[in-house]
């Protein structure tokens, strides 16, 4: 009995000693704010500054000396993007980074169902966690100012209230996986053409009633852990280091305690980035560096230039302490969160969620009978139609491939043509009908007129012999359509 007592006492003392030796910042039982304060007190100025800028295309540094890990980010918001190379935009060609492609956020918003938003956030969060991402760059909540915006498909429509309601469950469920939402693009990034140069001027009423409500809901109701700054200027100052929108509105008025992260290449000035609310700088092309070169990350605005300004007393030390505190808080919530689940990817549950969201988001304008007083056309009666013609490039195009940063590498995808053939078999014929060109970023194919005429003529002739024609049209992720970096040139469909 005495030996058992001594053994128990020794074990208790050992646990107490280990606990006493564990730094506060490493102790999960301590409040996050206490951990942030303790970690900050142990860091050098150089280590604090190193937190504030990229170390690769999609990661920022931790503090190796203290065992604090780096942050890994991934494009979203419709799925976790395939792995990108360390220093350039090329794909790493991994064989294990395929995921589920979820419907576009426009489709999610069209469900008008917050439960669908919660399912979306839960599933995409599990996939991001499985892929060991700490920050998912989404959801996008910019308002449709015009239907010509090439990136509208990434957003939740033109209604500020709808976007506000729908983004909250997405964020909450995503972050339950220990993955931060990075709500984008804050703010007023409502066109792609010249997005890095335009200066947006608007009234306070338009700003607060139309363009900011979804961001405000994301912060105050959704509890978003990070925000992505936009490329454009707002009232003369770049959005990624805009004193009015970042310091005054986001951090003071809304009490945002997370990180502001640039869109890639969105920083332009060290002093403004230091004092106007930017926390992490990603993807900059400073000092002659281009998107094709190996980046010297220490040349970033919030790297050595910022460090030197701090040492010279040109910016207050309080700026780096605030930035480092916010970044540490984000790391403790994500990369150092030992309670986060393992995650999963491309599961039947995720496929079912994507299918359910897609079904609820379908907008059927009209399901009229083919003949007066007859039955509605849909669903297609296999016994009635023996020769079904499918027309359209989108019937065979995988729309997850293209669109810029939102393009995805899927584990499995069924095209509309394959889906119809799976049900109706050899009754289904196909004609392309038109040429859309390849889905490319920054440029578009020019289609010769003789090709256009030939494809149209073929489809017309085949349609004359068909009992039923199914046209699969719409935009197709090409540049100057629904693709990052360019806006639509016309209202018409290809």
Describe these PLM feature segments:
Residues 1-23:
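Bacterial Sec-dependent N-terminal signal peptides
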Residues 20-494:
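Glycoside hydrolase catalytic-domain context in secreted enzymes
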